[in-house]
């Protein structure tokens, strides 16, 4: 049994898979990504220049762990606290258009496919790509010497 996505750190995996998506050059980044907010609860657009690839990698990881998932579930996952000044804060969903466009572009790369029961799921090729990236970043453990008692 090899290394899977569940065996590595989520942060390291997301960064590595985002770099893989960016390096492949097959995923087109829309021009509106420089100035769009990721939700109505945000004040500014993301500071990270590669946030689009990072969000795509994060979506792939979520689909690996819990599949199938639709646009609404990603709105909830990436949602946050809306600050309303002196009024109490409330939860607010994230932008669904970003999740939808990302899933459509991942479908074009044959990483994600539509599930017949609703939502999206990883393809076998997508699962294989994710496991391969996870195996590359997994720490190489040296075999430990047997303990003598």
UniProtKB/Swiss-Prot annotation:
Top-level lineage group: Eukaryota
Q: Which PROSITE patterns match?
A: RIBOSOMAL_S19E
Q: Which GO terms describe its molecular function?
A: RNA binding; structural constituent of ribosome
Q: Which InterPro entries match?
A: Ribosomal_eS19 (IPR001266), Ribosomal_eS19_CS (IPR018277), WH-like_DNA-bd_sf (IPR036388), WH_DNA-bd_sf (IPR036390)
* GO biological process per UniProt: ribosomal small subunit assembly; translation
Q: Which GO terms describe its cellular component?
A: cytosolic small ribosomal subunit
Annotated keywords = Ribonucleoprotein, Ribosomal protein
UniProt lists the family membership as follows: Belongs to the eukaryotic ribosomal protein eS19 family.
In terms of PANTHER family, this protein maps to: 40S RIBOSOMAL PROTEIN S19
Q: What is this protein called?
A: Small ribosomal subunit protein eS19
Q: Record the organism.
A: Mya arenaria (Soft-shell clam)
